[in-house]
C-alpha cells in the first residue's frame, strides 16, 4: 500500500515508520528482555534477515513502477538492519543504529526524487518515461546520490552502514550471511540502474515530450538537496555518527 500514498506522506512513512518494528525488536532484545538474544534466536533471526533481503531485492528487480521498486527496497534494507540485530553485541547494535539513521535519510530522499520524476513526466512507470538526463541533468544527479548510497557505494553513507554490518558478520564467521548481503547489494545496483537507464538515459517514448516545468516543485527540490547533502556529509565524515552509534549502543541493555 505504500506506493499509493501521496509523495510527502510516503517519504515520511518510508523513512520513519518502517523503523518502528526494528526499534521494537532492538529494545526487546536489550532493555526489555536482557539476554533474550540467545544463540538459537540469533541464528534464526539472521536467516530471517537474509531471506528478507533476498525477497525484497528480487521484488524490486521485478517491478517497473518506481514506487513499487522503492517499496520493495524498504523490505530488503530492513533485512540488513535485522542482520545487524542478529549479530548482537555492542558492535552489532552500533551497526543497527548507524544503518537505521542512514536509511531514514536515503529512503525518504529516494521517494521524494521519484515524486519529482513523476512531476516532470506524469508517470511512475519506467516503461512510459525517459529522456530526463538530457532534459533535467540536475535531477539525474539528485537521484544518483541516494541511489548509490542505497547500494553502498563510497563515499556515501550507505557504504559505511554496510561496512559496519559486514565487518561484524565476518568477525563472527558468518560467511553465508555476508555473501547474501553482498549479492543483495549487486541486485540493488541493478534495480537502481534500471531506474537510471529507463527514466534518465533512454529517450522518451514520445519524441514530442517535454518535461512539465509548470508545477511548483521548489520545496521538493530543497528537501531532496538537503537530504542528499546529509548523505554525502555522513559519507565523507562518518566517524562522528559511528561514535554516536557506538555510545548509544553501550547504553542499550544497561538502562534501569
Give the residues covered by each predicted segment:
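Hydrophobic transmembrane alpha-helices and their helix-loop junctions in integral membrane proteins
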Residues: 1-163, 167-189, 193
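Cytoplasmic/organellar membrane-interface segments at the starts of transmembrane helices
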Residues: 5, 126-127, 134-139, 192-256
Amino acid at each position: 500500500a505504500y506506493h499509493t500514498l501521496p509523495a510527502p506522506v510516503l517519504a515520511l512513512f518510508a523513512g520513519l515508520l518502517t523503523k518502528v518494528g526494528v526499534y521494537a525488536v532492538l529494545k526487546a532484545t536489550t532493555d526489555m528482555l536482557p539476554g533474550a538474544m540467545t544463540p538459537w534466536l540469533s541464528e534464526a533471526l539472521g536467516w530471517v534477515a537474509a531471506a528478507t533481503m533476498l525477497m525484497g531485492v528480487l521484488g524490486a528487480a521485478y517491478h517497473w513502477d518506481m514506487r513499487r521498486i522503492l517499496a520493495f527496497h524498504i523490505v530488503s534494507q530492513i533485512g540488513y538492519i535485522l542482520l545487524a540485530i542478529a549479530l548482537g553485541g555492542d558492535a552489532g547494535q552500533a551497526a543497527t543504529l548507524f544503518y537505521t539513521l542512514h536509511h531514514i535519510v536515503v529512503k525518504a530522499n529516494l521517494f521524494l526524487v521519484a515524486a519529482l520524476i513523476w512531476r516532470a513526466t506524469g508517470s511512475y512507470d519506467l516503461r512510459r518515461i525517459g529522456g530526463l538526463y538530457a532534459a533535467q541533468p540536475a535531477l539525474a544527479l539528485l537521484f544518483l546520490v541516494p541511489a548509490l548510497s542505497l547500494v553502498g557505494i563510497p563515499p556515501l553513507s550507505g557504504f559505511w552502514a554496510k561496512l559496519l554490518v559486514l565487518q561484524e558478520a565476518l568477525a563472527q564467521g558468518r560467511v553465508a550471511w555476508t555473501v547474501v548481503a553482498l549479492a543483495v547489494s549487486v541486485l540493488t545496483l541493478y534495480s537502481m540502474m534500471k531506474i537510471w537507464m529507463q527514466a534518465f538515459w533512454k529517450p522518451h517514448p514520445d519524441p514530442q515530450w517535454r518535461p512539465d516545468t509548470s508545477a511548483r516543485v521548489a520545496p521538493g527540490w530543497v528537501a531532496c538537496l538537503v537530504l542528499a547533502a546529509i548523505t554525502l556529509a555522513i559519507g565523507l565524515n562518518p566517524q562522528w555518527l559511528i561514535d554516536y552509534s557506538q555510545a548509544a549502543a553501550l547504553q542499550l541493555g544497561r538502562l534501569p
